[in-house]
C-alpha cells in the first residue's frame, strides 16, 4: 500500500475515526516514507481528548483502522510514543487529518 492510498482511505473514514475519539491522525514509518512492502503493517498515532480514551476505545480505533486499510496496523496515541523515538517520529510523520 502506498502512502497516498493509505491517506486517501483513512480520510474517507475520518468521521468514523472521529466518532471513536480520534482528533488528529498521523501516518509514520515505512508507509509514510514510501518504503512499505506488501507485508508491511501501517504505523499510525493519534491525538485524542484527554480523559476520553481507555483500553477498549484504543482497541476499537485499532480495529477500525485495520479494517479501513485492509492490513495490520500499529496504532498508538501521541503520548505513548517511545520518548527516545518521539521527536524523530513526529518530525517524519504525515498528518492524515
Q: Which sequence ranges carry the predicted segments?
A:
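Catalytic core of pol beta-like nucleotidyltransferases
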Residues: 1-24, 32-38, 50-97
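Short hydrophobic/aromatic beta-strand micro-patches
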Residues: 28, 45-47
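A short, structured beta-strand/loop element
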Residues: 38-39, 44
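General secondary-structure edge motif
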Residues: 44-45, 69
